[in-house]
């Protein structure tokens, strides 16, 4: 079966209407994992299979450095691993990793109270939770708030068990309770690691210049973390819309309906 020009136009229009962000937005897709309880939160890749059942995005920077971002969820918690594969010089309690999330997909210019960031330094087991909505420009409109009881974040050094490199390098592990940030099928999402020796932030989305502690850009510059269902659908609703449009065209073709 060959689609005629009109049918192709319908598909293209459907894509433009229903799926504008799939082409233009920077996105990371997370995945469901049922082995979260097996994770050993010690700030390193403890055993080979530990983070295997999570999504994977390798961020490559212009200076040759690489950052692996792995994400997953079990319905109650979000798991994030920032594996800075290329960083081999360490500054304990100065290097850090940070994860920022918001359920507000409109992503305002100024942080609101539904914007959260979780920061942990290298060598620390004590994360900091930052919440938006503060009036102080000096703190990027974020203020420190109480950690959720279930929050875990640890900065450490991975070694021979790491999937990407056996050379010791910085790694940051996060377990973020979903109730602490709210449920959504699409989160605003930003992650970064700070290399104190070079005074440089490596982040996703890339090319956001902000070395001022805690290196949190405007939420309007964050990307998206697409979660599998409203509790965290296997695809976000725009994909269903696209698929439905495509199947509708195929149905019309099979019925040989003339326009």
Residue ranges and their predicted role:
Residues 21-25:
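Sec/Tat signal peptide C-region and signal peptidase I cleavage site
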Residues 237-255:
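A cross-kingdom C-terminal cell-surface attachment/processing module
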Residues 43, 77-85, 170-178:
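Short, well-ordered beta-strand segments enriched in hydrophobic/aromatic residues
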Residues 121-166:
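Glycine-aromatic-enriched beta-strand/loop faces of beta-sandwich-type recognition domains
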Residues 12-20, 246:
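Bacterial N-terminal signal peptides
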Residues 167-211:
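Ser/Thr/Pro-rich, low-complexity mucin-like regions
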Residues 226-240:
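Short, threonine-centered small-residue motifs that mark membrane-proximal processing/anchoring sites
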Residues 27-28, 46-135, 195-202, 208:
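Surface-exposed, glycine/proline- and aromatic-rich loop segments on solvent-exposed faces
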């Amino acid at each position: 079966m060959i689609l005629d020009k009109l049918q192709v136009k319908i598909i293209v229009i459907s894509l433009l209407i229903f799926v504008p962000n799939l082409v233009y937005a920077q996105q990371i897709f997370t995945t469901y994992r049922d082995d979260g309880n097996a994770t050993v939160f010690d700030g390193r890749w403890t055993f080979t299979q530990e983070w295997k059942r999570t999504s994977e995005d390798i961020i490559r920077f212009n200076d040759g450095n690489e950052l692996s971002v792995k994400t997953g969820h079990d319905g109650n918690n979000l798991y994030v691993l920032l594996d800075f594969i290329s960083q081999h010089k360490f500054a304990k309690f100065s290097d850090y990793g940070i994860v920022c999330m918001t359920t507000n997909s409109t992503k305002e210019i100024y942080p609101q109270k539904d914007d959260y960031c979780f920061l942990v330094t290298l060598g620390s087991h004590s994360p900091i939770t930052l919440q938006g909505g503060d009036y102080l420009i000096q703190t990027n409109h974020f203020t420190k708030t109480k950690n959720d009881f279930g929050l875990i974040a640890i900065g450490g050094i991975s070694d021979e068990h790491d999937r990407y490199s056996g050379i010791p390098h910085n790694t940051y592990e996060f377990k973020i309770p979903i109730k602490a940030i709210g449920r959504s099928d699409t989160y605003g999402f930003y992650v970064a690691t700070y290399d104190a020796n070079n005074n440089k932030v490596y982040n996703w989305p890339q090319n956001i210049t902000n070395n001022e502690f805690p290196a949190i850009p405007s939420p309007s510059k964050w990307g998206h973390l697409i979660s599998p269902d409203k509790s965290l659908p296997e695809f976000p609703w725009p994909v269903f819309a696209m698929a439905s449009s495509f199947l509708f065209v195929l149905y019309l073709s099979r019925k040989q309906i003339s326009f």
